[in-house]
Amino acid sequence: VPFWSSEPTVRKVYKVSIPMEKEMQFQFYQGECTSSMRYEDGRKAYTFAMEDMMPFRREPNMVDLFDAAPKLMMSSTPHWKDKSLWFNKVNEDYGSFAPLPEAQKKVDELIKGKKTEMEKIAVLTHWVADNIRYAGISMGKGEGYTLHDTKMNYTDRCGVCKDIAGTLVSFLRMAGFEAYPAMTMAGSRVESIPADHFNHCVAVVKLADGTYMPLDPTWVPFCRELWSSAEQQQNYLPGVPEGSDLCLTPVSAPENHYVRIKADNRLDANGTLRGTFTIQAEGQSDSNIRSIFTRGFQSQWRATMERQLLAVSPKARLLSVDYGRRSEERRVGKEC
């Protein structure tokens, strides 16, 4: 529960009433509040309040407000393992990942000729990422932590993160892997109290060595990674049958995200600089460079390249662009 405000506030109160037989744990972070628990009409009433609140001061490029401003976290779930087991059971009972003949045919086609587990995982992750379009369509009451089934996702070919992740889990299972959905909070940390503080759904797959590898097909389009390294050290909770504690995504070393620029320039007698740049990148650096092209229409590519040059010099002129048939064949001529 966010306990910050964008306006001066005299008093903010949050009250929750639960059955007597229920237990609830809570903690207030990054500030102080008054709290109480009273018995009212045969129920437990928890009240939390702050007074004389001023707008929380923001800073440029600051962390998410959930990581800096006052907030209340509470849960009736004892431990993260309990929530992990529940998340697993609710989807297994519903049959979210039941195999589908036409989807099985596609899986067999994709993994044909792939020899290693990582080759199979990669081709399935990228196909799901590129072919299940992200589209948030309201379906009314009932939307929540239960993932839509394979038939719906494969037929519609669209959905939000849980539909994309659910499709990948289904594909991985049809390829013989042990895979499950996982919950995460993109943009801020998840505290130790097992509260419902998630905004994103991903997947995990068990590797041959017995470890689970996180996969995020929602962020994979136009990205060479299987998990966005822009989300390093991010908390996530897998819905696995043995139950899991809160996990943390691994750190990716800087050398996995290099940028190498080779410049071949010549200064003419009249002071004009002519030449070419060759840029090589990997990981998130590669994704950032690709985003110059992937975040707009192809008809805007030339204007986009011109903006890149004008950022170097307002007198720069784009002479020519040869995008080639493949990304590695794209060449740009420039003049400064």
Predicted regions and their residues:
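Secretory-pathway-linked proteins and extracytosolic
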Residues: 1-142, 268-271, 276-293
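Short, solvent-exposed loop/turn segments at the edges of secondary structure
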Residues: 9, 41, 102, 196-200, ...
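Solvent-exposed beta-strand/loop surfaces of large extracellular or lumenal domains
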Residues: 26-46, 182-185, 251, 291-324
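Short, conserved phosphate-binding/catalytic loop or strand-edge motifs used
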Residues: 104-105, 140-149, 185-187
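Active-site-proximal cofactor/substrate-binding loop regions of enzyme domains
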Residues: 121-123, 129, 141, 148-159, ...
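Hydrophobic/aromatic-rich core segments of domains that either
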Residues: 162-252
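Long, His/Glu/Asp-enriched segments that create or flank divalent metal/ion-associated functional microenvironments
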Residues: 246-249, 259-264
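Conserved small/polar residues in nucleotide/adenosyl-binding loops
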Residues: 329-336
